[in-house]
Swiss-Prot record:
<keyword id="KW-0244">Early protein</keyword>
<dbReference type="InterPro" id="IPR011705">
    <property type="entry name" value="BACK"/>
</dbReference>
<protein>
    <recommendedName>
        <fullName>Protein OPG030</fullName>
    </recommendedName>
</protein>
<dbReference type="Pfam" id="PF07707">
    <property type="entry name" value="BACK"/>
</dbReference>
<dbReference type="InterPro" id="IPR009177">
    <property type="entry name" value="Orthopox_C5"/>
</dbReference>
<feature type="domain" description="BACK">
    <location>
        <begin position="95"/>
        <end position="177"/>
    </location>
</feature>
<comment type="similarity">
    <text>Belongs to the orthopoxvirus OPG030 family.</text>
</comment>
Length: 204
């Protein structure tokens, strides 16, 4: 980190890159003794962006530590924002992963899930610890997401790889084929007959 003083941070306020209160929090942390106490997910995300802008590893570490704490109180209203923060910054949080796995059906019914890109959907659903009663539940989550997305055949194939087709009945496959656009149907049939599968833990 290059040397800077308080006035350098004050100058940032005039550039309108970061909020004034965020700059003040960073200034007091870097040059004072104030700790980061905010529980605002949005503020923590902006603080982390500022820490990266300043190349201040100490501030980054403190923000991550605080986000880890806030993550313990994650809910359906903020899960996607928190998830995006960790994913975009190459970070992991076991509590976040556990929350997603245990509440997958509720999460997949949110608008935030339907707006995710294909990589995020795969990241969320391709997990052996997801708690579901049957694999068809996961397939329906993917189908609902596809209703809101127009993806190419490569992305369709990619997202379908999260399905353990060994646990899908032919009747369930037939129902799924009826729900998807015609251009995907042959691909889905082919994937089913390949029986690509990995273990899945089911909630009995």
């Amino acid at each position: 980190m290059a040397y800077m003083n308080r006035s350098d941070l004050d100058k940032l306020k005039h550039e309108n890159i970061f909020s004034g209160n965020i700059i003040e929090d960073a200034k007091e942390f870097v040059f004072g003794s104030r700790k980061i106490y905010t529980d605002s997910v949005d503020d923590l995300i902006e603080l982390y962006s500022l820490a990266k802008y300043l190349n201040n590893e100490n501030l980054k570490d403190v923000v991550i530590e605080r986000m880890d704490y806030v993550c313990k109180y994650i809910g359906k209203d903020n899960w996607s924002t928190i998830y995006s923060f960790y994913k975009e910054n190459g970070l992991r949080n076991s509590f976040l992963r556990q929350y997603i796995n245990n509440n997958i059906e509720e999460i997949c019914n949110t608008d935030q899930f339907l707006k995710l890109d294909v990589d995020s959907v795969c990241d969320i659903l391709d997990n052996d610890e997801i708690v579901v009663t049957r694999e068809y539940t996961i397939l329906n989550m993917v189908l609902r997401w596809l209703e809101n997305k127009r993806v190419n055949i490569d992305d369709f194939t990619k997202v379908m790889f999260v399905i353990r087709f060994k646990f899908i009945t032919y009747s369930e496959l037939t129902n799924a084929i009826k729900k998807i656009a015609p251009e995907y149907r042959q691909c889905l049939q082919d994937l089913y007959h390949m029986k690509i599968t990995r273990p899945r833990h089911f909630d009995n």
